[in-house]
């Protein structure tokens, strides 16, 4: 582990333990288990990242029921939101698996066979569900399938926005990317999305390209940032 980091493992009797990642002023990196611990740490550190489980899926469900779209590209798409809510209620375990298992996809590297996408998804948690953040990558390469806009995806529910949660969550994700072997990751946002741009720049994002991305409408201009992990600083 890099200097300034430590790991603390705590055992709980919860039937399906969750991992909680939290940053503290001394920059320690701590992994706790259990939904109750998540709530305790949230009150002390503003937010934590909690691994999705059947124990905390109800927060995601409640957000969908309020009209939140987990896909930032499909805001105000009520048909999509209702379909997601119906899918969750029909098969909760199957819906949850979408956040923990990646599809087998073709890479953009011509000499590599199709690989399974690695997905690390977390709920953003302050004592209740605030949104999610995901780190996705292909083993052995920093390149991504064309349909994915960068290594990171996130969304904050509207009633939790404006509190700095996205910035904190992105910072908490960097040690996870570092553990996967990345010195830097690609983070993308719409040119018109000033809030997301501020989030990325606050965490140290460096703009390296502006233009369209195959993951979205060709008329939508994107900003492409490199974001260094601790090993890349």
Task: Indicate where each model-derived feature is located.
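Conserved active-site alpha-helix within GNAT-family acetyltransferase domains
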Residues: 192-209
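Loop/helix-junction capping segments adjacent to catalytic residues or to phosphate/diphosphate-binding pockets
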Residues: 57, 163, 194
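Short phosphate-binding/catalytic loops that engage adenosine nucleotides
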Residues: 165, 182, 205
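Conserved GNAT acetyl-CoA-binding A-motif
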Residues: 179-188
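Hydrophobic adenine-recognition pocket in adenosine-nucleotide-binding enzymes
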Residues: 156, 189
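GNAT-family acyltransferases
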Residues: 4, 8-12, 17-151, 158, ...
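Conserved acetyl-CoA-binding loop-helix of GNAT-fold acetyltransferases
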Residues: 154, 162-175, 198-202
């Amino acid at each position: 582990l890099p200097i300034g980091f430590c790991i603390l493992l705590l055992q709980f009797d919860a039937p399906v333990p969750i991992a909680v990642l939290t940053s503290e002023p001394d920059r320690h990196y701590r992994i706790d288990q259990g939904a109750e611990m998540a709530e305790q740490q949230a009150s002390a550190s503003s937010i934590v990242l909690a691994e999705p489980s059947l124990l905390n899926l109800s927060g995601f469900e409640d957000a969908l029921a309020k009209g939140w779209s987990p896909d930032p590209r499909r805001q105000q798409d009520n048909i999509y939101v209702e379909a997601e809510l119906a899918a969750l209620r029909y098969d909760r375990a199957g819906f949850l698996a979408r956040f923990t298992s990646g599809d087998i996809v073709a890479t953009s590297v011509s000499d590599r066979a199709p690989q399974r996408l690695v997905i690390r998804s977390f709920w953003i948690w302050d004592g209740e569900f605030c949104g999610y953040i995901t780190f996705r990558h292909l083993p052995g390469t920093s390149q991504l399938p064309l349909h994915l806009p960068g290594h990171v995806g996130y969304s904050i529910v509207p009633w939790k926005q404006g509190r700095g949660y996205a910035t904190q969550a992105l910072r908490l994700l960097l040690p996870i990317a570092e553990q996967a072997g990345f010195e830097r990751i690609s983070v993308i946002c719409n040119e018109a999305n000033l809030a997301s741009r501020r989030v990325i720049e606050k965490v140290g994002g460096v703009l390296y390209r502006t233009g369209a991305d195959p993951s979205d409408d060709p008329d939508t201009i994107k900003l492409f940032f490199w974001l260094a992990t601790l090993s890349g600083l």
